């Protein structure tokens, strides 16, 4: 009976961390974990991190740097611990700041506005592409100004707070 109880506790912990992410995200984390678990023992240790860095071209990583990474974990880093660590890091991320930073990549001068045509092109041709209808809906809800600029700072504020900035 005791092993079943232990298993239930582990299962409960798993269900909490696994509910933080969508299934596709969990699969992506699993792929990253598998790549980092160089010796395929189900745990990421110092040697795995060193080998991962080497595979990425960083061969002179200091022991202290690797030790600091390992210390972030509460114990041996299996997949559940790995997922929990990422969940805790992502949980603290401010959604408004995250979205603003994504727009700022395209606004190196920091004006707070982008040409609507450029935004439309980026949304329909890059990464997880929006459909024409989705972009049309966005511009219907957040129309560009008379000069064709989209005030992305205000857009992000409305997305994250549900109201316009004063």
Curated annotation (Swiss-Prot):
Effect in UniProt of substituting residue 58 to Q: In CMH10; impairs calcium binding; bind calcium upon phosphorylation
Tissue: Highly expressed in type I muscle fibers.
Keyword field contains Nucleotidyltransferase: no
Subunit structure of this chain's protein: Myosin is a hexamer of 2 heavy chains and 4 light chains. Interacts with MYOC.
Function description: Contractile protein that plays a role in heart development and function. Following phosphorylation, plays a role in cross-bridge cycling kinetics and cardiac muscle contraction by increasing myosin lever arm stiffness and promoting myosin head diffusion; as a consequence of the increase in maximum contraction force and calcium sensitivity of contraction force.
Residue numbers bearing the Phosphothreonine modification: 52
Record's keyword terms, sorted: Calcium, Cardiomyopathy, Cytoplasm, Disease variant, Metal-binding, Methylation, Motor protein, Muscle protein, Myofibrillar myopathy, Myosin, Phosphoprotein, Repeat
PTM sites of type Phosphoserine: 15, 19
SUPFAM superfamilies documented for this protein: EF-hand
A cellular-component GO term for this protein: myosin complex
Protein name as it appears in the record: Myosin regulatory light chain 2, ventricular/cardiac muscle isoform
Pfam name, any one: EF-hand_7
Biological process per Gene Ontology, one example term: negative regulation of cell growth
Domain EF-hand, first and last residues per copy: 24-59, 94-129, 130-165
Originating gene: MYL2
GO MF terms held by the record: actin monomer binding; calcium ion binding; myosin heavy chain binding; structural constituent of muscle
Keyword Metal-binding: yes
Gene3D superfamilies, per the entry: EF-hand
PTM summary: N-terminus is methylated by METTL11A/NTM1. Phosphorylated by MYLK3 and MYLK2; promotes cardiac muscle contraction and function. Dephosphorylated by PPP1CB complexed to PPP1R12B. The phosphorylated form in adult is expressed as gradients across the heart from endocardium (low phosphorylation) to epicardium (high phosphorylation); regulates cardiac torsion and workload distribution.
In-chain residues carrying the UniProt-annotated modification Deamidated asparagine: 14
PANTHER family given in the database record: MYOSIN REGULATORY LIGHT CHAIN 2 (PTHR23049)
Protein species of origin: Homo sapiens (Human)
Modified positions (N,N,N-trimethylalanine) in chain numbering: 2
Outcome after substituting residue 22 to K: In CMH10; some patients present with mid-left ventricular chamber thickening; significantly decrease calcium binding affinity; loss of phosphorylation
